[in-house]
Each structure stands twice: as C-alpha cells, then as structure tokens.
C-alpha cells in the first residue's frame, strides 16, 4: 500500500507543517496515511510499546471498578457479568432506531460505560500518555495555530488535550445494540460546520479483548470523515465495516469519522479503554459555571438568557461523575 510520507510520493497536507519526524521516527507513516485516507487506523500491539502485562493490569482495574459501581456484581472476561443487573429507567439513546431496553418487548441491555478511567490505575494513565497514540493524535488534530513568532526550526505548540478521563465500554453477549443503523455517529458532531481537515476531537481506543464482528466490534465507514458532515441515520449501515483487531491494539480515528458498533453475539466480554481528546480551542476561555456560580449572574435584564449563555444546564463539561450504573440484584451462578 502507498505511504503518505517519504518514498518520493506526494506528501499529505499536514506533513509540511506538523511533526513529520515523530511519525517517521515511530514508523507510523502507514497509519498516518490510513488516517488521512480512511479516517481510522489500527496499530497492532507490537508497535504500541505497551506490554500485555500492562493491558492485563488495565483490565483488572476496570473489572474491579465494574464490581464496585454495580454493588458487588462479579465479572470476568470469559463469562461477563455473573449476576442479574437492574438498569433502572435509564435514558433515551441519542442513536436513531435504538431499542429502549426498559420496555419488556425489547432485548435486555447488555452494555454499560465506566468513566474517569485515569483515576483508577497507573496502567490507564500510561495509556493516556502513550507516545504512539499521541503522535497519531497530534497528526490529525494539528498544532495550536497561534500567531506567536517561532524560532527557526521550532515547532508550534501541540493542541490536543484530554476531553475526559477516559471511558471503558463494557459489553457482553445479547441482542441489544445500537439499532439498525449501528449507532453511526461522529464525535465532533457538536462542533460548528463546515469542518476542515483537522480533527476537532479524536478517540484513541485500546482493545482490551480481541475485536471481531461477531464479538460486537466497533464499526466505521471508511473515508466518511471527508464528507465533513454527520450521518443522516438513514441507510448508511451497509457502508460500515468492522474494526477487527487482536487484544492490545490501538485504534485511532478522526472526529469526523462515522462509527458505531455491532451487537455482541459471542460469550464473554468485549472490553476497551477509550481516551477521548479534543483540540484545545474546543472549550471556553473561562469556566463560568464555576467562577459565576456564587456570583450575581442573574442580576441582569434577562436572567434566563444569562443562564443559557453561561451554560449552567449544559451536559458538558461535567463537574463530576454523574453516570447511572446498573445495580447487582442477584447471582446467576448455579
């Protein structure tokens, strides 16, 4: 396959202005090409610099957290949750066509998400600062882009920042999924359009188990980031392909890439650790929800508008872990 850097071939757009040496030094030229061309790349375990011991430690930390937040439900990679879980009323999915698991005539819910991973263990913090992952994120997010003068040969500051503390999507066998359109969406869909070449958001997902289509793998539409728009939710699923990868792989994709997931049809867990990044400009200059909380923000002609402008009722940025986790209601181990 062609490469985007070197070899006498036409250089990619970003190579002229952004960290080509880092990509070359880490032997990531092919992955940079795939990000440009397909909007997603899979880095095999042997190229990430992360040992299987560290991957297993991350797994143990996530499974221990699952047992903690569910109120004691045992769980393993082989068997999945070994107990009955009550998901409560839940909340309506943002994906069109997704079954409401609360209704009795719909499949039982078989997935939950754990947040704030980098609080849990050193292994997960190491994944967040992995050199290979960050080189690829730098490549598609691009530089800070400020107007400060640079010394000759000096590179502009890097612009990627953590958007959250990482999430683990814990998924087990069942018919419940993201609906007929596979939940296709893109991560920067809340950003103003039209988008450009640079990614405003970027995911780096570590496959903590083997990924296969039957095993509920991530899916994506190759090249969809070039459309610079969100999927319509009508009929794009046939374009999606599975992200199939061995345990310990790194999957990086552009914020404009359409992606979702297949339902998991096999026993055991499908587990990942997903580190979500953003361009540094995708934020406010001042955290007004904090700085104005105890100030007279409502002393104005239109308090309702001021509340909206400050963003007191916005979902993001979260000021703590407000996730609702399923609760362990009984063992199913015989």
Write out the residue ranges for each language-model feature.
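Catalytic core of non-heme Fe(II) oxygenases with the double-stranded beta-helix
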Residues: 173-244, 284-292
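Short hydrophobic-aromatic micro-motifs
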Residues: 42, 206, 251-253
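Non-heme Fe(II)-dependent double-stranded beta-helix
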Residues: 2-37, 43-184
């Amino acid at each position: 396959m062609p490469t985007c850097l070197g070899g006498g071939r036409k250089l990619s757009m970003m190579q002229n202005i952004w960290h080509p040496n880092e990509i070359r030094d880490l032997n990531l030229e092919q992955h940079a090409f795939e990000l440009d061309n397909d909007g997603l790349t899979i880095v095999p375990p042997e190229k990430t610099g992360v040992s299987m011991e560290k991957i297993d430690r991350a797994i143990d930390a996530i499974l221990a957290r699952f047992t903690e937040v569910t109120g004691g439900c045992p769980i393993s990679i082989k068997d999945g949750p070994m107990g009955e879980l009550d998901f409560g009323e839940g909340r309506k999915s943002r994906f069109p066509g997704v079954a409401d698991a609360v209704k009795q005539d719909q499949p039982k819910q078989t997935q939950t998400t754990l947040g704030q991973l980098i609080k849990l263990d050193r292994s997960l913090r190491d994944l967040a600062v992995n050199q290979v992952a960050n080189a690829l994120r730098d490549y598609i997010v691009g530089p800070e882009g400020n107007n400060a003068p640079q010394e000759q040969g000096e590179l502009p500051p890097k612009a990627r920042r953590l958007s959250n503390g990482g999430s683990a999507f814990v998924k087990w066998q069942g018919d419940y999924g993201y609906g007929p359109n596979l939940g296709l969406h893109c991560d920067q869909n809340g950003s103003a359009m039209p988008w450009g070449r640079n990614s405003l958001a970027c995911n780096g997902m570590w496959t903590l188990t083997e990924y296969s289509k039957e095993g509920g793998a991530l899916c994506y539409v190759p090249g969809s980031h070039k459309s610079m728009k969100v999927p319509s939710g009508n009929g794009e699923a046939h374009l999606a392909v599975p992200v199939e990868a061995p345990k310990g792989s790194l999957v990086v994709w552009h914020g404009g890439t359409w992606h979702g997931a297949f339902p998991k049809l096999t026993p055991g867990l499908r587990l990942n650790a997903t580190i979500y990044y953003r361009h540094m400009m995708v934020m406010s200059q001042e955290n007004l929800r904090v700085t104005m909380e105890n100030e007279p923000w409502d002393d104005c002609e239109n308090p309702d508008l001021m509340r909206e402008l400050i963003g007191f009722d916005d979902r993001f940025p979260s000021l703590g872990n407000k996730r609702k986790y399923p609760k362990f209601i009984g063992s199913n181990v015989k």
